[in-house]
C-alpha cells in the first residue's frame, strides 16, 4: 500500500505536466477558445475563427512572445459589426469588416483580396471573403489520449458555404495541427480562392530583424504603388533574391527595412516537395515559428509586408506586420481577377469545388527554441514522431516532438 501511494505521489506531477486542456478565455477583449499544455498555448477566436495566439508559456518574456499580429487598436467580434456605430472606427471601405476583427492567422475564403465588383460591395461582401468575418461556433471538445481537439465551424450565408476546423494540441508538444473542411452548399460547381493568411506583428515582426525561410522557387512582385513599394513593382523573383525599388539586388529573407513602405510578392512553392514549409524568426528572440502544409493544396505563397504606409482607418500609419499567405492563389486581387488570370508559371491561380461537395485540407504550425546567432533554416523535414529543422550553413538540427500524424 505504501509503495502504491509513493508511486501515485511520483506520478501526479508527471500526469499533470502531460495534460492538454481546453477552456474559454477573453483575449484582448475577444472571445477565445484556448488549447494548451504545460509549455504551449493556442487561442482561436469566435469572431472570424482567427488563430490569434501561438506561443510558448514561459516566465522569460522573450521566449513567451506571441508571434501573431495583435492590432494596436481595439478589435470587435466582426459578426457584430454595425455600420452606424463602427464605420467611424474602422472606415466605410469594403475592408472594414475584416479590419474590425483582424488578428493573427485568418482564413481567406471563398475569395482572396477585394470584392470583385461594386455589386458585391453593395451586398456587404468585403476583403478576403466571408469566412474571416462570421461567427465560428464551438461544436465539441474531444480528449483522445494525450491530446485535446477543438471542433468549431461557421456558416457563410451570403456565399453559401460551410467551413469547419478541428484544432489539435498534444501534451508536451509545441505543435498545433489544423484539419479544415469546406462544404459547397450550392448545387453547382464553383471556383474559389482558399488561402491561409498567417499574420505576424510586433515585437516579433520588425523590419530588418524578422527573417523568413521558405521552400519556394520563383515568383513575382505585385504591381502595387511604386511610391510606397519597398521592392520594384512587377519584378521577377528567384527565391531568395529580389530587386529593391531603386533597382538594386536585395535579399527577401529579411522584412524590408525602408520606412513608410510595404510590399507584396508571390512565390511558387517547390512542386517536387509533397510538404511545403515556411519558417520565421526574429534575430533578437529565441523563438522560431514554422508552418507545414501539403504543396498540392497550396501551390502558392505570398509575402505581404506593411511598414506604416497605410494611413487609412483604422491603420493610421501605425501598422507593422508581415503576412505569409499560402493557398490556391498567388495575388490578393479578388476571385474574378484570379479566374481571369487563370494560370501563372503554368500553375492554376484558383480551384474548383463541386456542387454539394465537401473537401478537406490540413496544415501544421510549430514553435522551436533557437540559439543566439541562429543563421536561419536550410530545410524542414517530417520524421516519425518529430519535425526536424536544419540550420543554414552549420547543418545543425533542432528536433520538435510531433506525435500527431502530419497530412
Each language-model region and where it sits:
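Surface-exposed acidic/polar loop and edge beta-strand patches at domain peripheries
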Residues: 19-177, 188-407
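N-terminal secretory signal peptides that target proteins for export/translocation
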Residues: 1-2
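Bacterial N-terminal signal peptides
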Residues: 5-14
